[in-house]
Amino acid sequence: MTNADTVAARTPPPKLKTPALAVLFATVFINLVGFGLVVPLLPFFAQSLKAEAWQITLMFSAYSLGQFFAEPFWGRLSDRIGRKPVLLMTLIANALGYLMLAFVPNIWLAIAVRLFTGLGAGNISTVQGYVADVTPPEQRAGRMGLIGAAFGLGFIVGPGLGGLLTQPQLGRLGYQLPIFLAAALAAVAAVGVVVFLRESRAKADPAAPRPAFLAGLKDARDNAVVSRVLVVTLIYMAGFSAMESVFGLWSESRYQWGAREVGLSFMIVGIVSTLNQGFFAGRLARRFGESRVLATGMLLFG
């Protein structure tokens, strides 16, 4: 047993009290609200920077690319140095990313800033790790469900609010208002982490072996069920992301929509998705089987 294991065994983890749970809920909620706030305005904001269509889609991809690479990194780092500092660093990075986006002078800097913001947004696994650290096994599913609810609620509120706050008639300021709000929310969540969260994990022994990211991918590849689920999820998310990146441009060309209409459309998607996951998917899967429900969902999505 290492020294870190001994310390962890002697020091019980803090109980997950209401303020701490609220901060964790807010962290996930803010990640999705911040993402959703800028989704409806990004195409039009990029057009104000004289961006071409392919550059606009690249700006969307940059955020997701950063999040993809950052998620396992932040998770492993939180195992080493603790959950609280990682949550604080990612929230500060989010706030800085949104502030920089508001003032970028050209599309290439906007793409770089979106990549940076995505790197700071990959903290969902850290939140889940904190919940697992301080929650008894019999309560863990319920607590994780709350985190999932924050995810869904954030994607409902964010696009709708972003669309309503965008005021193109004000020029650049009309696009900056939702971005400033996203930055302010991230800053408030960072303060909440400092004030209300106790560290849930003892600092790890630097000499202790740590699981490698590529080893995890190999394990997933060797498990037939997991690998198939990952492939299906990848295809689904790729399709959704492709639609998301061009929807604003397409709806503007086809229906003369602006950020408000695009935001409300994504808000409706969030509402339907949350209702489906929370109330219908489980019941339908128990009645008709998971494979049939999954296949039907994919067909409806297409």
Residue positions per predicted region:
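C-terminal membrane-cytosol helix-exit motif in multi-pass small-molecule transporters
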Residues: 184-203
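Short amphipathic helix-loop junctions that connect adjacent transmembrane helices
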Residues: 40-54, 245-262
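Cytoplasmic membrane-interface "Motif A"-like loop-to-helix N-cap segments
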Residues: 80-91, 286-298
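Helix-to-loop junctions at the C-terminal end of transmembrane segments
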Residues: 70-82, 276-290
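Cytoplasmic helix-loop-helix junction between adjacent transmembrane helices
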Residues: 112-152
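Conserved MFS/SLC helix-loop-helix module at the cytosolic interface between two early adjacent transmembrane helices
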Residues: 68-107
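Juxtamembrane intracellular "pre-TM" segments in multi-pass secondary transporters
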Residues: 7-18, 198-231
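Residue-level signature of mid-helix packing/kink "hotspots" within the transmembrane helices
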Residues: 36, 64-72, 122, 155-156, ...
